């Protein structure tokens, strides 16, 4: 397989066919996984070597589907570019689309740049039905599919890849890929800013692999688009439960949806609670506030004085605040460590309750500062250097 950049691949395509391929490689997002694009490889030509200029008119199309990559050969005729292409469906030799149900094949228009992309999408719809029919080899997996199909939350956003045989046991197996109906629209935009180049929509996909027809070995895995994974605290922030022995997808999938929805709500709530917290500190400490994060409300620095001893307090508010307690870092402005850093002490355990409002937290923090400063000052003089 020769992997080429999209632009280099296009440069080798016959000019008459190039607009059709442009739509494929530049706008080719199909199916549930909007982060994966269609790719073309193995460019070849059916023309004689005497034909001038770029004349590739056949290639292999890589299509993301249900966690697999389908590889279909698409064959044009550069000498008669107005004709529709032929398709070879790789390992799915028994997949035979019904031509009359492919409008963009019946009314093929080589002058319409998106015609090939639309035809591929129509074929994928038939391919989905083909895979669903293969589930009939397993009554248990067919039950899983029918149960999901009856629920409008899942039935319209599901891909199936079925009928793979385990080379050791000969068992039938299948994979379900579902787009979870979780609302990400209210996640604070600043959490998504570092993924501005993230392709596709914000989405959560649940892949569930059945390694045998009786569902004794089931392996779920959650995939989040990069922006959502970043917003929720990284790949390690969310662990989905194992698929229960004897369980069913129609019971398991809503549990994962609820888990993810709760996580999103924690993040949204944390943003508003952090904003409330910092507003309360601005009110209580006034001119003592040196700086604060006015976008995500994740940091706050105070300059305070106790008996002519000046010090800084850095407050770091976690993503899942108020469930998780803020970290306080006390820092002397006079004393240095042996490594040349300002002497500091980190406090992660102090009077705190996630049920307090921002005003109560600010009042309690002020009281804690007063009680802790003598100890901090003593440590600064004993361990720091002026």
UniProtKB/Swiss-Prot annotation:
GO molecular function, one term: polyubiquitin modification-dependent protein binding
GO cellular component, one term: nucleus
Coiled coil stretches, renumbered: none
Record keywords, A-Z: Apoptosis, Cell cycle, Cell division, Chromatin regulator, Cytoplasm, DNA damage, DNA repair, Mitosis, Nucleus, Repeat, Ubl conjugation pathway
GO BP, sorted A to Z: apoptotic process; cell division; chromatin organization; double-strand break repair; mitotic G2 DNA damage checkpoint signaling; positive regulation of DNA repair; response to ionizing radiation
Major localization class: cytoplasm
Region (UEV-like 2): 278-367
InterPro entries: BRE
Region (UEV-like 1): 33-150
UniProt subcellular location: Cytoplasm; Nucleus
Domain comment (free text): Contains 2 ubiquitin-conjugating enzyme family-like (UEV-like) regions. These regions lack the critical Cys residues required for ubiquitination but retain the ability to bind ubiquitin.
Description of how the protein assembles with itself and partners: Component of the ARISC complex, at least composed of uimc1/rap80, abraxas1, brcc3/brcc36, BABAM2 and babam1/nba1. Component of the BRCA1-A complex, at least composed of bard1, uimc1/rap80, abraxas1, brcc3/brcc36, BABAM2 and babam1/nba1. In the BRCA1-A complex, interacts directly with abraxas1, brcc3/brcc36 and babam1/nba1. Binds polyubiquitin. Component of the BRISC complex, at least composed of abraxas2, brcc3/brcc36, babam2 and babam1/nba1.
Family: Belongs to the BABAM2 family.
Function comment: Component of the BRCA1-A complex, a complex that specifically recognizes 'Lys-63'-linked ubiquitinated histones H2A and H2AX at DNA lesion sites. The BRCA1-A complex also possesses deubiquitinase activity that specifically removes 'Lys-63'-linked ubiquitin on histones H2A and H2AX. In the BRCA1-A complex, it acts as an adapter that bridges the interaction between babam1/nba1 and the rest of the complex, thereby being required for the complex integrity. Component of the BRISC complex, a multiprotein complex that specifically cleaves 'Lys-63'-linked ubiquitin in various substrates.
Name of the protein this chain belongs to: BRISC and BRCA1-A complex member 2
Source organism phylogeny: Eukaryota, Metazoa, Chordata, Craniata, Vertebrata
């Amino acid at each position: 397989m020769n992997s080429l950049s999209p632009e280099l691949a296009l440069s080798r395509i016959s000019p008459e066919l190039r607009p059709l391929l442009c739509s494929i490689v530049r706008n080719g997002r199909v199916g549930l996984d909007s982060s994966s694009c269609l790719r073309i490889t193995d460019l070849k030509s059916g023309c004689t070597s005497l034909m001038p200029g770029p004349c590739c008119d056949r290639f292999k199309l890589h299509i993301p589907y249900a966690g697999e990559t389908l590889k279909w050969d698409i064959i044009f005729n550069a000498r008669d570019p107005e004709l529709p292409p032929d398709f070879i469906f790789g390992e799915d030799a028994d997949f035979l689309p019904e031509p009359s149900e492919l409008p963009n094949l019946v009314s093929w228009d080589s002058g319409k740049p998106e015609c090939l992309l639309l035809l591929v999408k129509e074929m994928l719809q038939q391919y989905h039905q083909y895979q669903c029919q293969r589930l009939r080899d397993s009554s248990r997996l067919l039950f899983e599919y029918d149960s999901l199909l009856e629920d409008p939350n899942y039935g319209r956003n599901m891909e199936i890849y079925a009928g793979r045989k385990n080379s050791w046991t000969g068992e039938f197996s299948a994979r379900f890929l579902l787009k979870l109906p979780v609302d990400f629209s209210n996640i604070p935009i600043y959490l998504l800013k570092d993924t501005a180049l993230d392709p596709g929509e914000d989405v959560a996909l649940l892949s569930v692999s059945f390694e045998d027809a009786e569902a004794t070995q089931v392996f779920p895995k959650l995939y989040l688009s990069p922006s959502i994974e970043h917003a929720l605290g990284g790949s390690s922030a969310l662990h989905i439960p194992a698929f229960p022995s004897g369980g069913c997808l129609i019971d398991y999938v809503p549990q994962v949806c609820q888990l993810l929805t709760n996580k999103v709500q924690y993040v949204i709530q944390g943003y508003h609670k952090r904003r409330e917290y910092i507003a309360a500190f601005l009110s209580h400490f006034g001119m003592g506030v040196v700086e604060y994060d006015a976008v995500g409300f994740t940091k706050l620095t105070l300059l305070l004085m106790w008996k002519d001893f000046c010090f800084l307090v850095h407050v770091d508010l976690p993503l899942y605040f108020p469930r998780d307690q803020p970290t306080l870092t006390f820092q002397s402005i006079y004393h240095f460590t042996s490594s040349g850093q300002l002497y500091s002490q980190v406090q992660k355990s102090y009077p705190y309750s996630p049920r307090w409002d921002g005003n109560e937290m600010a009042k309690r923090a002020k009281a804690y500062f007063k009680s802790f400063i003598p100890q901090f000052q003593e440590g600064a003089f004993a361990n720091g250097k002026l």
